[in-house]
């Protein structure tokens, strides 16, 4: 997959910047930063003003890294409190420091996630492949 992430000036439609970045996830914009997850499971923080990459963090892309089998698919990120939150089809919820990109916690889920997490009312909601909805926080 190919693709770009870009910033537009809404009143004029003028393209401010663009980055080659294959993604199928929605960007999360917070303050001066755009947080984006690529199709190869790399999470990045881009400057909203310039598109410059502040940090990039590779999330685990495979369960078996030696054989490169059993792909892990991540959804997100969303900003919940002071952490970025992502979920995976490998029954994991990851929290990431938005300033440094450091993975601060991996929390097991009872089943694979099936969609991006949602942050609302001080909680993170996770839809599982079983059809259950978890409310965390």
Show where each model-derived region lies.
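C-terminal hydrophobic structural anchor segments
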Residues: 74-98
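Hydrophilic extracytoplasmic domains
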Residues: 88, 98-137
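WD40 beta-propeller blade core
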Residues: 6, 44, 94-95, 134
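Extracytoplasmic beta-rich repeat domains
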Residues: 14-31, 56-79, 105-121
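Solenoidal tandem-repeat scaffolds enriched in leucines and small polar residues
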Residues: 1-17
